């Protein structure tokens, strides 16, 4: 398994490049707008980007998912959770809770983790040749090191009245999903 964390300090935005070296395929999770970084990582490691995942609809930065898909031919795997008003309005592969996608030998399992946003999903990664147990969890803005995402932003920053309490309750319930993880 190949893994590289890509961090944009100016935006405080993290993305991830994961790949199956045996199959020569890779995925990018939450790509930043400047996609050249991922193209270069793929080139340096003899991999083709075939999958693009997003943890949620990003309001705080411009994502590079659509451009990266156009340049590489990769499929976009995006949340199909959240209900009306939280749908992506362009072609993608919709992902629901417990859906699984293989990137070579790497298994990506979807966990619906609403709270920060209603459609938020996390990705549980298992390196199947090495282990039956997951080795990484990509949570987007749902969980941070030592903190959790803010369920109040939709109400405070976007003016979506009545979402703060619902978001906090959803986040509380979502956190309990993690108690079942190894």
Regions inferred by a protein language model and the residue ranges of each:
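Metallo-beta-lactamase
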Residues: 24, 107, 117-182
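Active-site environment of divalent metal-dependent phosphoester hydrolases
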Residues: 36, 57-62, 83-86, 118-119, ...
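Hydrophobic, small-residue-rich alpha-helical packing segments that form membrane-like cores
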Residues: 25, 65, 69-70, 74-76, ...
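Conserved beta-strand hairpin/beta-sheet module of binuclear metal-dependent hydrolase folds
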Residues: 1-48, 122-140, 146, 150
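Metal-associated gating/positioning segment near the N- to mid-region
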Residues: 61, 66-67, 73-76, 80, ...
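Active-site neighborhood of phospho(di)ester-bond hydrolases with catalytic His/Asp-centered motifs
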Residues: 28-29, 49-58, 77-80, 112-115, ...
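Active-site metal-binding motif and surrounding structural segment of the metallo-beta-lactamase
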Residues: 33-77
């Amino acid at each position: 398994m190949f893994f590289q964390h890509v961090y944009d300090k100016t935006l405080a935005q993290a993305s991830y490049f994961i790949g199956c070296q045996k199959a020569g395929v890779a995925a990018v999770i939450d790509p930043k707008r400047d996609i050249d970084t991922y193209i270069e990582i793929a080139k340096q490691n003899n991999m083709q980007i075939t999958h693009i995942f997003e943890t949620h609809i990003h309001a705080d930065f411009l994502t590079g998912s659509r451009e990266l898909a156009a340049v590489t031919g990769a499929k976009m795997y995006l949340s199909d959770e959240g209900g009306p008003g939280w749908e992506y309005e362009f072609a993608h592969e919709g992902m629901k809770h417990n859906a699984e996608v293989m990137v070579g030998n790497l298994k990506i399992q979807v966990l619906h983790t609403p709270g920060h946003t209603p459609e938020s999903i996390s990705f549980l990664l298992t390196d199947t040749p090495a282990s039956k147990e997951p080795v990484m969890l990509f949570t987007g803005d749902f969980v941070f090191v030592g903190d959790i995402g803010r369920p109040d932003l939709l109400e405070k920053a976007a003016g979506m009245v009545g979402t703060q309490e619902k978001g906090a309750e959803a986040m509380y319930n979502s956190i309990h999903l993690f108690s079942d993880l190894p």
